[in-house]
Amino acid sequence: MAMRSGRHPSLLLLLVLLLWLLQVSIIDSVQQETDDLTKQTKEKIYQPLRRSKRRWVITTLELEEEDPGPFPKLIGELFNNMSYNMSLMYLISGPGVDEYPEIGLFSLEDHENGRIYVHRPVDREMTPSFTVYFDVVERSTGKIVDTSLIFNIRISDVNDHAPQFPEKEFNITVQENQSAGQPIFQMLAVDLDEENTPNSQVLYFLISQTPLLKESGFRVDRLSGEIRLSGCLDYETAPQFTLLIRARDCGEPSLSSTTTVHVDVQEGNNHRPAFTQENYKVQIPEGRASQGVLRLLVQDRDSPFTSAWRAKFNILHGNEEGHFDISTDPETNEGILNVIKPLDYETRPAQSLIIVVENEERLVFCERGKLQPPRKAAASATVSVQVTDANDPPAFHPQSFIVNKEEGARPGTLLGTFNAMDPDSQIRYELVHDPANWVSVDKNSGVVITVEPIDRESPHVNNSFYVIIIHAVDDGFPPQTATGTLMLFLSDINDNVPTLRPRSRYMEVCESAVHEPLHIEAEDPDLEPFSDPFTFELDNTWGNAEDTWKLGRNWGQSVELLTLRSLPRGNYLVPLFIGDKQGLSQKQTVHVRICPCASGLTCVELADAEVGLHVGALFPVCAAFVALAVALLFLLRCYFVLEPKRHGCSVSNDEGHQTLVMYNAESKGTSAQTWSDVEGQRPALLICTAAAGPTQGVKDLEEVPPSAASQSAQARCALGSWGYGKPFEPRSVKNIHSTPAYPDATMHRQLLAPVEGRMAETLNQKLHVANVLEDDPGYLPHVYSEEGECGGAPSLSSLASLEQELQPDLLDSLGSKATPFEEIYSESGVPS
């Protein structure tokens, strides 16, 4: 026991000593590490950076495309040297692990070691590589203890794709005259394997050609894939070829694919056109152009209606003067010879044409596998032309000429001479165009002279030129004609006076614009200096024009017309003298109508005014007929009403004063004039009046004073009808102051003679005025104010009283209808 207890203190002492040594060692170690850290920090400051030792260790990760397995398959292993000091856990993430594409493709066996596995085959063409992240964490804390490792897993390529053409079949067209060695088509195949590797390198091969011809073939460039022509193509031999092309890669094992190319040969011009006949003869009449005088047939073995078949003709020799032209018939391919310029038998009765033919497309030939230009000249034919004689037309020398003459030349003035020649026959001249009939031509000599005065202002003159056309006609069969033209230039003279323009002759002015100036325009067909500027002057010798009108500003061709006072509605004449630049003038009249305007711009009642012109012209005629009808009615009344054997009264034989009486009473009002007033006005001529009962419009005689009644009784006498000389008795008047009428029948003719003479004179004057107005061609229409419609005068045949014997007392009971006539006759002293 004592020994055991003695050992224990020594053990404890040894243990304490060890702990002290460990503490000192730890302190020294910490101090050393601190010093080292400080030293390293200083070295980092004062020394360049150095690469630290890698703590990640990873084997090469390689994965072959389309690896058959078995799966899962180990592809690599990870290691981190920090696993010596602590317990670590490895993590993997990224595309192929937990991200697209290919989720779940890679994984770790467990998290304690870094073995990496793949779980299925990989298509490199889909995903050529994967970028994955590796991390290491402390198992106890889950804290990442080192920097993440980023690793790119590359998928190695295998030759698993063959080259592919974009189409299974190709259709191309090649010209027959395609030059050998030139590429005609480019083949291209695509290999999806890794680029710039043998797996994606493509080579091209021509496997077969159908048909296989020795002189016509194709070849393919192995690297570029261009198809080239070897030799010459012949459309007639092989119009189409079929080529089988293969594309192969250089991988192990190599893969390939094929495609078919159909080559259509488009025919070229490799056959020369040839005339079916080498010599032609044709007869052509002289003096006229002709179409299709000859057709030349050619043969061509190329395909019809192509540019290699269509013929193109050309006149190589004999057409130096341009008489001929040749074209091609598009349907038959024939050459059509035309005469476009008339031939002349006298100049060249015969000639020869050399015509050549070629195609629209260039002609080529194949020799020794190469295209060569033609060595022979184009095919030709000879056409012998025989010109037949015909009647040549005359020819003018010169065909047209200009003659300058002053207008107003007298008849017989020589204008010029036409000269025509015809080697075959005689010539006569005919005038065919002379619209104004101013000239004549001598049929033998062609001399043109005037037969009428010529006027530059004629409508047949255009820009001072008057055209005269002459024909020269020969006496051949059939007759031929030539045309010559004389251009007559007329110099102007001052032979026209200025005149008013049509729109300035008759002008309308609204009442509201009567003080605004009117623009009066004039014109003169003469040229400078015989025309404008014009001078305008008012004719002050005519009426009161200077008191009403005034001329304003002169514009050369027009002048302002101003009014000096207000004018009522109506028609006015404004006389003007208008002179040209040389002083030649003439009096002109402007007709101005002042009228109302509803809109302020245009006169109204235009239609009524036009009708008024005709009514005004017919008014004197109508008045004459009305006066005649009234006179006849009056005579009929006197004849049938008055009794021939009534008492007469002595009447003075004086004619009396010819005082005008106003017959404008249009109503049935009562007259305010007494018999004494009438008697005072016309004392020398007493005309009887009678009333059948109470007469409207005339006072009863009972209301008249005795003196006036006696005078009135003397004025009532018995008169026969006009010109009949039959006496009549006045009707009884109910008045105590009335006296019997004079029974002398010879008084009738004495009283009617002056009245009948005045009536005949008046009718003759009216008829004369009507005839003058009707026959006067220089009458200018006037506008009159509206006076109503003119009543038509009834014809004599419409008066029934002339056709039968009427009772003497027929007119005694007319009543109020005859009152206006009785008033008029009683006021004027005419017997009723």
UniProtKB/Swiss-Prot annotation:
Alphabetical GO biological process terms: adherens junction organization; calcium-dependent cell-cell adhesion via plasma membrane cell adhesion molecules; CD4-positive, alpha-beta T cell activation; cell migration; cell morphogenesis; cell-cell adhesion mediated by cadherin; cell-cell junction assembly; homophilic cell adhesion via plasma membrane adhesion molecules
Highest taxon in the source lineage: Eukaryota
Protein name: Cadherin-like protein 26
Membrane topology according to the record: Single-pass type I membrane protein
Known role: Cadherins are calcium-dependent cell adhesion proteins. They preferentially interact with themselves in a homophilic manner in connecting cells; cadherins may thus contribute to the sorting of heterogeneous cell types. Ligand for integrins alpha-E/beta-7, ITGAE:ITGAB7, alpha-4/beta-7, ITGA4:ITGAB7 and alpha-4/beta-1, ITGA4:ITGAB1 through which modulates CD4(+) T cells activation.
Gene giving rise to this polypeptide: CDH26
Main location, first listed in the record: membrane
GO cellular component terms attached to this protein's record: adherens junction; catenin complex; microtubule cytoskeleton; plasma membrane
Subunit structure: Homodimer. Component of a cadherin:catenin adhesion complex composed of at least of CDH26, beta-catenin/CTNNB1, alpha-catenin/CTNNA1 and p120 catenin/CTNND1.
Residues bearing glycans: N81, N85, N171, N177, N462
Any Pfam family hit: Cadherin
Organism name: Homo sapiens
UniProt modification remark: N-glycosylated.
